[in-house]
A protein has these predicted regions:
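Long, well-ordered amphipathic alpha-helical subdomains in the mid-to-C-terminal portions
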Residues: 366-413, 431
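Flexible beta-alpha connector loops of hexameric P-loop NTPases
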Residues: 21-27, 57-61, 119-124, 169, ...
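Conserved beta-strand segments of the P-loop GTPase G domain that flank and frequently precede/overlap
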Residues: 14-18, 49-52, 84-86, 292-295, ...
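Conserved C-terminal guanine-recognition region of P-loop GTPase G domains, centered on the G4
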Residues: 30-41, 72-77, 87-103, 253-256, ...
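N-terminal accessory targeting/assembly segments
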Residues: 1-113, 425-426, 430-432
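Conserved nucleotide-binding/hydrolysis micro-motifs of P-loop NTPases
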Residues: 18-22, 54-56, 88-91, 110-113, ...
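Conserved G1/Walker A P-loop phosphate-binding module
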Residues: 4-10, 149-289
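Canonical P-loop GTPase G-domain recognition
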Residues: 100-158, 165, 318-324, 328-379, ...
Length: 432
Protein backbone atom coordinates (compact mmCIF):
# COMPACT_ATOMS: atom_id res chain seq x y z
CA UNK A 1 0.00 0.00 0.00
CA UNK A 2 1.38 3.38 -0.98
CA UNK A 3 2.00 5.82 1.86
CA UNK A 4 -0.57 8.58 2.21
CA UNK A 5 0.45 11.59 0.18
CA UNK A 6 1.35 14.48 2.45
CA UNK A 7 -0.37 17.79 1.92
CA UNK A 8 1.80 20.11 -0.18
CA UNK A 9 2.41 23.41 1.58
CA UNK A 10 3.69 26.58 -0.04
CA UNK A 11 7.21 27.50 1.05
CA UNK A 12 7.14 31.24 1.53
CA UNK A 13 9.84 33.89 1.80
CA UNK A 14 8.65 36.90 3.78
CA UNK A 15 9.87 40.37 2.84
CA UNK A 16 9.33 43.56 4.79
CA UNK A 17 10.39 47.17 4.29
CA UNK A 18 11.05 49.39 7.28
CA UNK A 19 10.85 53.01 6.17
CA UNK A 20 9.87 56.17 8.07
CA UNK A 21 7.69 57.35 5.18
CA UNK A 22 5.51 54.23 5.45
CA UNK A 23 4.53 55.04 9.05
CA UNK A 24 2.07 52.40 10.28
CA UNK A 25 2.60 50.27 7.17
CA UNK A 26 6.32 49.98 7.97
CA UNK A 27 7.56 46.45 8.72
CA UNK A 28 9.08 45.53 12.09
CA UNK A 29 10.37 42.32 13.63
CA UNK A 30 7.07 41.99 15.49
CA UNK A 31 4.95 42.50 12.37
CA UNK A 32 7.11 39.98 10.48
CA UNK A 33 6.54 37.42 13.24
CA UNK A 34 2.83 38.07 12.94
CA UNK A 35 3.04 37.71 9.15
CA UNK A 36 4.71 34.33 9.66
CA UNK A 37 1.80 33.30 11.89
CA UNK A 38 -0.62 34.43 9.17
CA UNK A 39 1.23 32.26 6.64
CA UNK A 40 0.87 29.29 8.99
CA UNK A 41 -2.83 30.05 9.38
CA UNK A 42 -3.21 30.11 5.58
CA UNK A 43 -1.59 26.68 5.31
CA UNK A 44 1.92 27.67 4.23
CA UNK A 45 5.31 27.55 5.91
CA UNK A 46 7.90 30.30 6.28
CA UNK A 47 11.16 29.44 4.52
CA UNK A 48 12.94 32.70 5.31
CA UNK A 49 12.55 36.34 6.33
CA UNK A 50 14.12 39.41 4.70
CA UNK A 51 13.66 42.72 6.54
CA UNK A 52 15.09 45.76 4.77
CA UNK A 53 15.73 49.26 6.12
CA UNK A 54 15.35 51.89 3.42
CA UNK A 55 14.68 55.63 3.46
CA UNK A 56 11.90 55.48 0.86
CA UNK A 57 10.26 52.69 -1.15
CA UNK A 58 11.37 52.23 -4.75
CA UNK A 59 8.48 53.26 -7.04
CA UNK A 60 8.98 50.30 -9.38
CA UNK A 61 10.16 47.38 -7.23
CA UNK A 62 9.38 48.71 -3.74
CA UNK A 63 12.66 47.34 -2.31
CA UNK A 64 15.10 48.31 -5.08
CA UNK A 65 16.75 46.27 -7.85
CA UNK A 66 19.65 45.10 -5.68
CA UNK A 67 17.42 43.75 -2.93
CA UNK A 68 15.17 42.10 -5.52
CA UNK A 69 18.19 40.19 -6.85
CA UNK A 70 19.06 39.16 -3.28
CA UNK A 71 15.51 37.92 -2.64
CA UNK A 72 15.49 36.06 -5.97
CA UNK A 73 18.66 34.19 -4.99
CA UNK A 74 17.13 33.43 -1.58
CA UNK A 75 13.99 32.06 -3.25
CA UNK A 76 16.06 29.76 -5.46
CA UNK A 77 18.23 28.52 -2.57
CA UNK A 78 15.33 27.56 -0.30
CA UNK A 79 13.02 26.37 -3.09
CA UNK A 80 10.29 28.86 -2.22
CA UNK A 81 7.08 28.92 -4.23
CA UNK A 82 5.83 32.29 -3.06
CA UNK A 83 7.01 35.66 -1.72
CA UNK A 84 4.77 37.65 0.63
CA UNK A 85 5.41 41.27 1.57
CA UNK A 86 4.48 42.66 4.97
CA UNK A 87 3.61 45.95 3.31
CA UNK A 88 0.95 47.00 0.82
CA UNK A 89 2.14 46.79 -2.78
CA UNK A 90 0.68 48.76 -5.66
CA UNK A 91 -0.71 46.65 -8.52
CA UNK A 92 2.22 47.64 -10.75
CA UNK A 93 4.80 46.79 -8.06
CA UNK A 94 3.18 43.41 -7.50
CA UNK A 95 3.19 42.73 -11.24
CA UNK A 96 6.88 43.74 -11.66
CA UNK A 97 8.00 41.72 -8.63
CA UNK A 98 6.17 38.62 -9.87
CA UNK A 99 7.98 38.87 -13.19
CA UNK A 100 11.42 39.50 -11.62
CA UNK A 101 11.20 36.88 -8.87
CA UNK A 102 9.58 34.18 -10.99
CA UNK A 103 7.14 33.11 -8.25
CA UNK A 104 3.78 34.32 -7.03
CA UNK A 105 3.97 37.57 -5.06
CA UNK A 106 1.36 38.64 -2.52
CA UNK A 107 1.20 41.50 -0.06
CA UNK A 108 -0.16 41.37 3.49
CA UNK A 109 -3.60 42.46 2.31
CA UNK A 110 -3.81 39.65 -0.26
CA UNK A 111 -2.76 37.08 2.34
CA UNK A 112 -5.37 38.22 4.86
CA UNK A 113 -8.05 38.16 2.17
CA UNK A 114 -7.06 34.57 1.37
CA UNK A 115 -7.40 33.59 5.04
CA UNK A 116 -10.78 35.28 5.29
CA UNK A 117 -11.95 33.38 2.20
CA UNK A 118 -10.95 30.09 3.89
CA UNK A 119 -12.62 30.94 7.20
CA UNK A 120 -15.96 32.51 6.21
CA UNK A 121 -18.79 30.02 6.76
CA UNK A 122 -22.09 31.92 6.65
CA UNK A 123 -23.62 33.46 3.54
CA UNK A 124 -23.10 36.91 5.01
CA UNK A 125 -19.45 36.24 5.80
CA UNK A 126 -18.78 34.86 2.33
CA UNK A 127 -20.47 37.85 0.69
CA UNK A 128 -18.34 40.28 2.67
CA UNK A 129 -15.11 38.46 1.83
CA UNK A 130 -16.09 38.24 -1.84
CA UNK A 131 -16.73 41.98 -1.92
CA UNK A 132 -13.31 42.69 -0.42
CA UNK A 133 -11.62 40.31 -2.87
CA UNK A 134 -13.24 41.93 -5.90
CA UNK A 135 -12.26 45.41 -4.71
CA UNK A 136 -8.70 44.18 -4.24
CA UNK A 137 -8.67 42.44 -7.64
CA UNK A 138 -10.14 45.24 -9.75
CA UNK A 139 -7.02 47.47 -9.99
CA UNK A 140 -4.86 44.36 -10.57
CA UNK A 141 -6.72 43.11 -13.64
CA UNK A 142 -4.43 44.94 -16.06
CA UNK A 143 -1.49 42.79 -15.01
CA UNK A 144 -3.46 39.60 -15.62
CA UNK A 145 -4.05 40.54 -19.26
CA UNK A 146 -0.84 42.45 -20.02
CA UNK A 147 0.62 39.45 -21.85
CA UNK A 148 -2.31 39.46 -24.28
CA UNK A 149 -2.08 43.22 -24.74
CA UNK A 150 1.61 42.93 -25.62
CA UNK A 151 0.70 40.30 -28.21
CA UNK A 152 -1.95 42.53 -29.76
CA UNK A 153 -4.33 39.60 -29.51
CA UNK A 154 -3.83 35.87 -29.69
CA UNK A 155 -2.31 36.01 -33.17
CA UNK A 156 0.24 38.69 -32.24
CA UNK A 157 -0.35 40.40 -35.66
CA UNK A 158 -2.76 43.15 -34.78
CA UNK A 159 -2.02 46.60 -36.27
CA UNK A 160 -0.79 49.44 -34.04
CA UNK A 161 -3.70 50.92 -32.15
CA UNK A 162 -5.93 47.92 -32.78
CA UNK A 163 -8.19 46.66 -30.03
CA UNK A 164 -6.97 43.13 -29.40
CA UNK A 165 -8.73 40.40 -27.42
CA UNK A 166 -6.54 41.14 -24.39
CA UNK A 167 -7.88 44.65 -24.03
CA UNK A 168 -11.41 43.48 -24.80
CA UNK A 169 -11.16 40.81 -22.10
CA UNK A 170 -9.85 43.39 -19.62
CA UNK A 171 -12.82 45.66 -20.22
CA UNK A 172 -15.20 42.71 -20.05
CA UNK A 173 -13.73 41.55 -16.74
CA UNK A 174 -13.97 45.04 -15.30
CA UNK A 175 -17.64 45.27 -16.22
CA UNK A 176 -18.36 41.81 -14.81
CA UNK A 177 -16.58 42.53 -11.55
CA UNK A 178 -18.27 45.92 -11.13
CA UNK A 179 -21.60 44.21 -11.77
CA UNK A 180 -20.81 41.57 -9.13
CA UNK A 181 -19.73 44.26 -6.67
CA UNK A 182 -23.06 46.07 -7.15
CA UNK A 183 -24.97 42.79 -6.62
CA UNK A 184 -23.03 41.94 -3.44
CA UNK A 185 -23.56 45.44 -2.06
CA UNK A 186 -27.29 45.09 -2.67
CA UNK A 187 -27.31 41.72 -0.88
CA UNK A 188 -25.36 43.19 2.05
CA UNK A 189 -27.78 46.11 2.21
CA UNK A 190 -30.52 43.54 2.74
CA UNK A 191 -28.41 42.05 5.55
CA UNK A 192 -28.22 45.53 7.10
CA UNK A 193 -32.00 45.88 6.91
CA UNK A 194 -32.51 42.52 8.63
CA UNK A 195 -30.02 43.46 11.34
CA UNK A 196 -31.76 46.80 11.82
CA UNK A 197 -35.09 45.00 12.31
CA UNK A 198 -33.48 42.65 14.85
CA UNK A 199 -31.99 45.64 16.70
CA UNK A 200 -35.37 47.36 16.83
CA UNK A 201 -36.93 44.24 18.30
CA UNK A 202 -34.20 43.98 20.95
CA UNK A 203 -34.62 47.65 21.80
CA UNK A 204 -38.38 47.19 22.05
CA UNK A 205 -37.83 44.30 24.45
CA UNK A 206 -35.13 46.34 26.24
CA UNK A 207 -32.54 43.56 25.90
CA UNK A 208 -29.06 45.10 26.17
CA UNK A 209 -26.40 44.10 23.64
CA UNK A 210 -22.83 43.31 24.70
CA UNK A 211 -20.25 43.12 21.89
CA UNK A 212 -16.96 41.26 22.37
CA UNK A 213 -14.10 42.92 20.47
CA UNK A 214 -10.37 42.43 20.44
CA UNK A 215 -7.23 41.52 18.57
CA UNK A 216 -7.31 38.28 16.64
CA UNK A 217 -6.58 35.22 18.81
CA UNK A 218 -7.12 37.18 22.05
CA UNK A 219 -9.69 34.61 23.25
CA UNK A 220 -13.00 36.20 22.26
CA UNK A 221 -14.73 32.96 21.20
CA UNK A 222 -13.41 31.17 24.29
CA UNK A 223 -14.92 33.93 26.44
CA UNK A 224 -18.27 33.65 24.64
CA UNK A 225 -18.23 29.90 25.27
CA UNK A 226 -17.36 30.42 28.93
CA UNK A 227 -20.11 33.00 29.43
CA UNK A 228 -22.94 31.29 27.55
CA UNK A 229 -22.04 27.61 27.38
CA UNK A 230 -21.97 27.87 23.59
CA UNK A 231 -19.87 25.51 21.49
CA UNK A 232 -18.22 28.03 19.19
CA UNK A 233 -14.96 26.65 17.72
CA UNK A 234 -12.10 28.33 19.60
CA UNK A 235 -8.74 27.32 18.18
CA UNK A 236 -5.34 28.85 18.78
CA UNK A 237 -5.00 30.41 15.34
CA UNK A 238 -5.48 33.82 13.78
CA UNK A 239 -8.89 34.78 12.39
CA UNK A 240 -10.62 31.63 13.61
CA UNK A 241 -13.89 33.54 13.89
CA UNK A 242 -15.18 35.64 10.99
CA UNK A 243 -18.93 35.20 11.28
CA UNK A 244 -20.65 37.10 14.07
CA UNK A 245 -22.19 34.78 16.65
CA UNK A 246 -24.81 36.00 19.14
CA UNK A 247 -26.04 34.21 22.24
CA UNK A 248 -28.43 35.05 25.06
CA UNK A 249 -26.73 35.39 28.44
CA UNK A 250 -28.39 35.59 31.86
CA UNK A 251 -26.15 38.02 33.73
CA UNK A 252 -28.18 38.12 36.94
CA UNK A 253 -31.64 37.34 38.30
CA UNK A 254 -32.96 40.53 36.71
CA UNK A 255 -30.96 40.85 33.52
CA UNK A 256 -30.60 39.00 30.23
CA UNK A 257 -28.28 40.34 27.53
CA UNK A 258 -27.36 39.40 23.98
CA UNK A 259 -23.61 38.76 23.65
CA UNK A 260 -22.02 38.99 20.19
CA UNK A 261 -18.58 37.72 19.18
CA UNK A 262 -17.04 39.74 16.34
CA UNK A 263 -14.24 39.28 13.82
CA UNK A 264 -10.80 39.81 15.31
CA UNK A 265 -8.79 42.91 14.52
CA UNK A 266 -5.14 42.98 13.47
CA UNK A 267 -2.50 45.58 12.70
CA UNK A 268 -2.67 46.85 9.13
CA UNK A 269 -6.13 45.35 8.63
CA UNK A 270 -6.92 45.88 4.92
CA UNK A 271 -9.27 48.80 4.36
CA UNK A 272 -11.16 46.63 1.85
CA UNK A 273 -12.07 44.28 4.70
CA UNK A 274 -13.08 47.06 7.08
CA UNK A 275 -15.36 48.45 4.38
CA UNK A 276 -16.72 45.04 3.33
CA UNK A 277 -17.40 43.92 6.91
CA UNK A 278 -19.29 47.06 7.88
CA UNK A 279 -22.56 45.13 7.80
CA UNK A 280 -21.12 43.05 10.65
CA UNK A 281 -18.92 45.59 12.39
CA UNK A 282 -21.60 48.28 12.51
CA UNK A 283 -23.25 46.15 15.20
CA UNK A 284 -20.62 47.67 17.50
CA UNK A 285 -22.19 51.11 17.04
CA UNK A 286 -25.46 49.86 18.51
CA UNK A 287 -24.02 47.87 21.42
CA UNK A 288 -24.78 48.97 24.97
CA UNK A 289 -21.42 47.72 26.23
CA UNK A 290 -18.12 46.61 24.68
CA UNK A 291 -15.90 43.92 26.17
CA UNK A 292 -12.40 44.61 24.82
CA UNK A 293 -10.58 41.28 25.23
CA UNK A 294 -6.79 41.67 25.55
CA UNK A 295 -4.30 38.79 25.59
CA UNK A 296 -2.22 39.99 28.53
CA UNK A 297 0.19 37.07 28.09
CA UNK A 298 1.33 38.47 24.72
CA UNK A 299 4.40 40.74 24.98
CA UNK A 300 2.79 42.95 22.32
CA UNK A 301 -0.51 43.34 24.20
CA UNK A 302 -0.24 47.12 24.58
CA UNK A 303 0.32 47.66 20.87
CA UNK A 304 -2.49 45.23 20.04
CA UNK A 305 -4.83 47.13 22.36
CA UNK A 306 -3.93 50.38 20.57
CA UNK A 307 -4.75 48.79 17.19
CA UNK A 308 -8.19 47.76 18.45
CA UNK A 309 -8.76 51.18 20.01
CA UNK A 310 -8.05 52.94 16.68
CA UNK A 311 -10.47 50.66 14.82
CA UNK A 312 -13.17 51.21 17.46
CA UNK A 313 -12.79 54.96 16.86
CA UNK A 314 -12.88 54.44 13.08
CA UNK A 315 -16.12 52.46 13.40
CA UNK A 316 -17.73 55.19 15.50
CA UNK A 317 -18.03 53.08 18.65
CA UNK A 318 -15.59 54.96 20.90
CA UNK A 319 -18.36 56.57 23.00
CA UNK A 320 -19.85 53.22 24.02
CA UNK A 321 -19.11 52.13 27.63
CA UNK A 322 -16.35 49.56 27.74
CA UNK A 323 -14.77 47.00 30.04
CA UNK A 324 -11.17 46.03 29.27
CA UNK A 325 -10.97 42.26 29.80
CA UNK A 326 -7.38 41.16 30.41
CA UNK A 327 -7.54 37.53 29.31
CA UNK A 328 -5.14 34.58 29.76
CA UNK A 329 -4.10 35.73 33.23
CA UNK A 330 -3.42 32.06 34.02
CA UNK A 331 -0.41 32.33 31.71
CA UNK A 332 1.08 35.30 33.54
CA UNK A 333 3.67 34.48 36.19
CA UNK A 334 2.92 35.42 39.80
CA UNK A 335 3.97 39.00 40.41
CA UNK A 336 3.65 39.98 36.76
CA UNK A 337 1.08 42.43 35.45
CA UNK A 338 -2.51 41.68 36.46
CA UNK A 339 -4.30 45.01 36.02
CA UNK A 340 -7.31 45.91 38.15
CA UNK A 341 -9.57 48.93 38.11
CA UNK A 342 -13.12 50.17 37.77
CA UNK A 343 -13.25 49.30 34.07
CA UNK A 344 -10.71 46.46 34.02
CA UNK A 345 -11.23 42.79 34.79
CA UNK A 346 -8.53 40.10 34.74
CA UNK A 347 -9.79 36.66 33.73
CA UNK A 348 -8.91 33.35 32.18
CA UNK A 349 -11.59 32.52 29.64
CA UNK A 350 -10.12 29.01 29.43
CA UNK A 351 -10.35 28.15 33.15
CA UNK A 352 -13.17 30.51 34.15
CA UNK A 353 -11.04 32.44 36.65
CA UNK A 354 -12.45 35.95 37.16
CA UNK A 355 -15.55 35.39 35.02
CA UNK A 356 -17.95 35.79 37.98
CA UNK A 357 -16.46 39.23 38.67
CA UNK A 358 -16.84 40.10 34.99
CA UNK A 359 -20.54 39.19 35.12
CA UNK A 360 -20.97 41.43 38.16
CA UNK A 361 -19.28 44.29 36.30
CA UNK A 362 -21.54 43.77 33.27
CA UNK A 363 -24.58 43.78 35.54
CA UNK A 364 -23.52 47.04 37.21
CA UNK A 365 -22.69 48.81 33.95
CA UNK A 366 -26.00 47.86 32.32
CA UNK A 367 -28.29 48.17 35.34
CA UNK A 368 -31.06 50.57 34.30
CA UNK A 369 -33.39 49.98 37.20
CA UNK A 370 -34.80 46.62 36.10
CA UNK A 371 -36.20 44.73 39.08
CA UNK A 372 -37.89 41.40 39.89
CA UNK A 373 -41.15 42.13 41.68
CA UNK A 374 -44.32 40.40 42.87
CA UNK A 375 -47.45 42.03 41.47
CA UNK A 376 -50.98 41.63 42.87
CA UNK A 377 -53.37 42.70 40.13
CA UNK A 378 -57.09 43.10 40.84
CA UNK A 379 -59.15 41.15 38.33
CA UNK A 380 -60.59 44.34 36.88
CA UNK A 381 -56.99 45.32 35.98
CA UNK A 382 -56.33 42.06 34.17
CA UNK A 383 -55.56 43.96 30.97
CA UNK A 384 -52.21 44.93 32.51
CA UNK A 385 -51.19 41.27 32.32
CA UNK A 386 -51.11 41.50 28.52
CA UNK A 387 -48.84 44.54 28.83
CA UNK A 388 -46.54 42.63 31.18
CA UNK A 389 -46.23 39.76 28.72
CA UNK A 390 -45.30 42.25 26.00
CA UNK A 391 -42.91 44.51 27.87
CA UNK A 392 -41.60 42.53 30.86
CA UNK A 393 -40.34 39.03 31.59
CA UNK A 394 -43.20 37.16 33.29
CA UNK A 395 -41.91 34.24 35.36
CA UNK A 396 -45.09 32.97 37.02
CA UNK A 397 -48.81 33.71 37.27
CA UNK A 398 -51.18 32.41 39.96
CA UNK A 399 -54.88 33.16 40.38
CA UNK A 400 -56.16 33.65 43.95
CA UNK A 401 -57.93 36.65 45.44
CA UNK A 402 -55.83 38.64 42.99
CA UNK A 403 -53.74 37.80 39.93
CA UNK A 404 -50.34 37.18 41.52
CA UNK A 405 -47.47 37.69 39.10
CA UNK A 406 -43.70 37.43 39.47
CA UNK A 407 -41.99 39.39 36.71
CA UNK A 408 -38.74 41.12 35.83
CA UNK A 409 -39.77 44.65 34.87
CA UNK A 410 -37.95 47.62 33.35
CA UNK A 411 -38.50 51.06 34.94
CA UNK A 412 -41.25 52.18 32.53
CA UNK A 413 -43.30 49.07 33.40
CA UNK A 414 -42.68 49.49 37.12
CA UNK A 415 -44.15 52.97 36.84
CA UNK A 416 -47.40 51.53 35.47
CA UNK A 417 -47.88 48.75 38.01
CA UNK A 418 -46.37 50.41 41.09
CA UNK A 419 -49.74 50.59 42.90
CA UNK A 420 -49.94 46.79 42.81
CA UNK A 421 -46.35 46.06 43.84
CA UNK A 422 -45.96 46.35 47.62
CA UNK A 423 -42.32 45.18 47.63
CA UNK A 424 -41.15 47.92 45.25
CA UNK A 425 -40.54 51.57 46.08
CA UNK A 426 -39.88 54.06 43.29
CA UNK A 427 -36.52 55.85 43.42
CA UNK A 428 -36.47 59.22 45.16
CA UNK A 429 -36.13 61.20 41.94
CA UNK A 430 -39.59 59.87 40.95
CA UNK A 431 -41.25 61.04 44.17
CA UNK A 432 -43.37 64.18 44.06
Amino acid sequence: MLPKKEEIRDKVVLVGLNSPVLREDSATEESMDELSALVETAGGETAGIVLQNRATPDPRTFIGEGKVAEVQLYVENVGATMVIFDNDLSPSQQRVLTELLGVQVLDRCGLILDIFAQRAKTKEGRLQVELAQYRYLLPRLIGMWSHLERQGGTSGKGPIGSKGPGETQLETDRRLINKKIDKIRADLEEVRRVRATQRQQRQKNEIPVVAIVGYTNAGKSTLLNQLTGAAIPANNRLFDTLDTTSRLLTVSDTMDVVVSDTVGFIRKLPHQLVEAFKATLEELEYADLLLHVIDVSNPEWQHQAEVVEKLIVELGANEIPRIDVFNKCDRVEAGDLRPHGADICSISARTGEGVDRLLEMIDRRLDKGTRRVTIHLPYDKGGLLDMLYREAKVESVEYSETIDIVAVCPPKVLGQIGDYTPDWTPPKEDWE
